[in-house]
């Protein structure tokens, strides 16, 4: 693939993720949109690592590190969402203000 195609794909993923994060009212959907944003960043890391640094794999290693951090973030986020759902019986963002009660 050419550089422009990969950058357009990454910008689409980033745009969809930011739009979904802003407009989402469900916590699980917001977490999925955050994962889309992180995947767009990973695509850029791998693309520019391949373009500028052919012999060293710094971008690839960094993207694997980001994938690991994103997996931990998703696990912790789902655990928090599960606890909120258990207490509040809802995963809607506007109904989960823990400072009210």
Curated annotation (Swiss-Prot):
Its EC number is 7.1.1.-. One of its GO terms (molecular function) is quinone binding. It is found in: Plastid, Chloroplast thylakoid membrane. It catalyses: a plastoquinone + NADH + (n+1) H(+)(in) = a plastoquinol + NAD(+) + n H(+)(out); a plastoquinone + NADPH + (n+1) H(+)(in) = a plastoquinol + NADP(+) + n H(+)(out). The chain crosses the membrane at residues 2-22, 32-52, 61-81. GO terms for biological process: ATP synthesis coupled electron transport; photosynthesis, light reaction. Keywords: Chloroplast, Membrane, NAD, NADP, Plastid, Plastoquinone, Quinone, Thylakoid, Translocase, Transmembrane, Transmembrane helix, Transport. Gene3D superfamilies: 1.10.287.3510. GO terms for cellular component: chloroplast thylakoid membrane; NADH dehydrogenase complex. Its main location: plastid. It is a multi-pass membrane protein. Belongs to the complex I subunit 4L family. NDH is composed of at least 16 different subunits, 5 of which are encoded in the nucleus. This is NAD(P)H-quinone oxidoreductase subunit 4L, chloroplastic.
